[in-house]
Amino acid sequence: MELRTVWWENDAVCLIDQRKLPHTMEVVRCTDLAAVAYAIRSMQVRGAPAIGCTAAYGMALVAQQSVALTPSALLTELVQAKATLDSQRPTAVNLAWATSRMLRRAEAVASEGVEAIKHALHAEAEAIFAEDLAMCHAIGEHGASLIPPRGHVLTHCNAGGLATAGYGTALAPIRTAFAQGRPVHVFVDETRPFLQGARLTAWELLQAGIPQTLITDNMAAFMMQRGQIDCVIVGADRIAANGDVANKIGTYGLAVLARYHNIPFYVAAPSSTIDLATASGADIPIEERDPAEVTHIAGVAIAPQGVRAAHPAFDVTPNELVTAIITERGIVRPPYLAALRQLESGR
């Protein structure tokens, strides 16, 4: 049975509080828009596809709870809800993609009345979830062929089932190759400062029985130098039209290291993460988070009181460092500007 990160239950958006993993499996019930927005901002739920699914359910929740008497009044509420949700994590394009799709669906059925909008949005949120899950499995099928025979893969952050509707993006090729009986061993970057690798990816791989070794972020170069890494597979929060990739802070450094050591560097992401309206990585907004997440771990200070800390949550990897992008429609290779447009036109 696959892990489900977010779901609709008894008129509420339910999700696993990923801040509590791996020690506690706690389900959070979001009963209003404010709770959904907080879940996204506080990283109770995280990972671009999972955020998109959560936001879609959040829009459906707003519609269900609305007392609007006319479609136009309900649409106004939904526009406001979209603005609230979109502002929570600005780097992840799946968030605005999902809320935009929900709003378009509401507008499409507005002539049928308020109840039609409510029913349509609930169905659309479920469709977004189901599509994301299917895309993850397709990414796994396409990407498994890229894993070298020895199967030593380095990952960064968490782009597994917890970050998506299920199965994952970066972990999907690994899981598929493992299911095919091929040798796989995953080197898991701990991923400071939020430790998504150590807390979440390591936990997911343990649940799946996939061999792994947890490493600190500053061990990656050493592991590459010693010949321990055959390829790198990461996820993405936004892919610009030219193939530049925004992902968890530290991804860019791994891409530079991989290029120096002649190691393939792959990005796995659904097509909903591709943003053709963003020309390059220079145009991607980079979220700045609370410096306390750097100076503290699990509420415990690890730095002197009063020290200043930087905390950009993402960085941008230039397209020339990306060997290929694995999508649900196939593997995209350079030149990305033309290849990504061709991929999108094939929808």
Swiss-Prot record:
GO biological process, one term: L-methionine salvage from methylthioadenosine
One term of GO molecular function: S-methyl-5-thioribose-1-phosphate isomerase activity
Enzymatic reactions: 5-(methylsulfanyl)-alpha-D-ribose 1-phosphate = 5-(methylsulfanyl)-D-ribulose 1-phosphate
Pathway named in the protein's UniProt entry: Amino-acid biosynthesis; L-methionine biosynthesis via salvage pathway; L-methionine from S-methyl-5-thio-alpha-D-ribose 1-phosphate: step 1/6
Enzyme Commission designation: 5.3.1.23
Keyword Electron transport: no
Binding site for substrate: 46-48, 89, 196, 247-248
Keywords recorded for this protein, A-Z: Amino-acid biosynthesis, Isomerase, Methionine biosynthesis
Residues flagged as site, Transition state stabilizer: 157
Enzyme's top EC category: isomerase
Short name of any one Pfam family annotated for the protein: IF-2B
Entry annotation: catalytic residues: 237
Statement: the UniProt record of this protein carries the keyword Isomerase: yes
UniProt family annotation: Belongs to the eIF-2B alpha/beta/delta subunits family. MtnA subfamily.
Job description of the protein: Catalyzes the interconversion of methylthioribose-1-phosphate (MTR-1-P) into methylthioribulose-1-phosphate (MTRu-1-P).
Name of this protein: Methylthioribose-1-phosphate isomerase
